[in-house]
Amino acid sequence: MKYFAGEYDVAVIGAGHAGIEAALAAARLGCKTAVFTINMDAVGNCPCNPSIGGTAKGHLVREIDALGGEMGKTADECFLQSRMLNRGKGPAVHSLRAQIDRRKYSTVMKHKLELQKNLELRQAEIVEIEKTEDGYDLTTRMLAVFHCKTVVIATGTYLGGRIFVGEVSYESGPDGIFPASFLGASLKKLGLPLRRFKTGTPARVSRNSIDYTDLEVQKGDEPPQPFSYETESLGENKVDCYISWTNDETKQIILENIHRSPLYAGKIEGIGPRYCPSFEDKIMRFKDKPRHQLFIEPCGLDTEEMYLQGMSSSLPEEVQLKFYHTIKGLENCVIMRPAYAIEYDCVDPTAMLATLEFKDFPNLFGAGQFNGSSGYEEAAAQGLVAGINAALKVLGKSPLILDRAGSYIGTLVDDLVTKGANEPYRMMTSRSEYRLILRQDNADERLTPLGHEIGLISEERYQKFLNKQELKKQEIKRLKTTVISPTEEVNKILTERGTSEITTGVHLIDLIKRPQLDYKSLESIDTGRPKLDPNIFEQVEVEIKYEGYISKQLKQVEQMRKLENRRLPDDFDYRTIKGLRLEAQEKLNKIKPLSIGQASRISGVSPADISVLLIWLAQNK
């Protein structure tokens, strides 16, 4: 028999990376919050890669931290090795990536939820969700009913989860945890547009069964850089990673057994991630490629499990072992956990607003893989947005909408709700038109004032941020006014760096603008240089060197925001506008864009359609 068990302002279904950020944000904004999880030992679980960050993902983590989220701080607490990716490219694509202790990460996050004021962590499977006059009723498998003003669905890969390993298939969530078997039917009954996606994970092998003799060692950067602006130091890197390569023999085993892959045998219905394909998918798609790289990464300090990055598979366990044994270093490896594919239910994100609230279901929000994305960082970013907006809805305040020009989080959300996701969506720097101004080094500059305004950034942290901004301003002023004389020592340094000598005094800022020079190379002649946070030097140098490009991009942002400010009605039938093509009418009615800017990014809406909309707006002011 059902029984009434309590009520909350905000309820979060799922305690993965999205659910954690949503719950913490809502509770910190003063809302009575609950987060429900099938298994409390799986809070903040990292069922795939034992790492946080990476290309574009590192940007997201820095932005989450700048807004007042938790992922960056916890990643720093659990870090094993840190590396800055893409150092050989421009600063826009520099991305931090950290190996983490995955079990410690889960433990630390669970404890943070337990200690958070206004927040209750509950082990309970939500099996039913029903709309009420002022919110939603959630029913657990134990028949407890909770009344909630707002709900955030963050079910990850648990919703209708099914594992595939060769011919073997069974209902399960990741890491052998029970799936959410009943909630999907309730969501469909409610009217949410669900579909099936698929992802996968590589095997974990025993550290002691690996031969490291001929493997390439991949060390971390020294000193390692933290994600969080509040982390002062990480200490030293604690582990090494290793690189190996597949070969022709590996390829042959895959080709001989491809019929045993559930993906190629037609057993998996869900659409998989384009940018994180299974190893057998790589072999089939790139048959001419003689070898593929893989990374061997530790899962923690107190475990012997090693993760084989780049080797996701759904082939039978014995086939996995056979092809692993063809790889240098893995000739005698022992599988501790086999690779598997997992299929799960998720929603069409175009059913949501930019607040991540469902258009047709007020007070119901979605976040993470439930929204069709992939990755821990993408999930955490959406969880933060959904949790903030669920709380702001309860508090009767204006919602948080991040635009594409202000953050990668805004780009991620806009892509999902405007363009949708026909496959698991992965964040990449190439998805942003404004990546030169959306660098990870200036995430605090872009988002910390907003985090403070919302209420997630403390006054103490905000004052530190303002002080940093003042120091940066003073340093730029110093560089503009400091004159370097043409001495023998100065010209020797310039010649050694491959740039022309100076014959008259030159402002320091003009030397830094030269492509061959940077802050470090000018240290010996810059005698008045103050001791500042390296992050300040980094920001100053980038802004000086790329001033022209940044200025050009800021003008593009100005134009874009003019279109974003041309608001469209949210309850309008576009079939009534003459001149719009049929496809545009259908897409506009489905997406219900909030602005001309958003309408222009909808696939199937042409520039001619936008012109029609602009004329219609002018006529109907």
List where the protein language model places each region.
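Short hydrophobic core segments
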Residues: 13, 145-156
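Glycine-rich phosphate/pyrophosphate-binding beta-alpha loops
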Residues: 369-377, 433-435
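Extended, charge-enriched "interface" segments that sit outside catalytic cores
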Residues: 431, 437, 448-453, 457-609, ...
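Internal hydrophobic alpha-helix adjacent to the cofactor/substrate pocket in enzyme cavities
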Residues: 379-400
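An anion/pyrophosphate-binding glycine-rich loop and adjacent beta-alpha core
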Residues: 39-41, 84, 184-321, 418-491, ...
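A glycine-rich dinucleotide-binding beta-alpha-beta segment and adjacent secondary-structure elements
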Residues: 307-373, 401-414, 533-587, 592
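Conserved N-terminal/central alpha/beta ligand/cofactor-binding core
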Residues: 3-7, 24-132, 142, 154-174, ...
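Beta1/beta-strand and adjacent pyrophosphate-binding region of the FAD-binding site
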Residues: 4-18
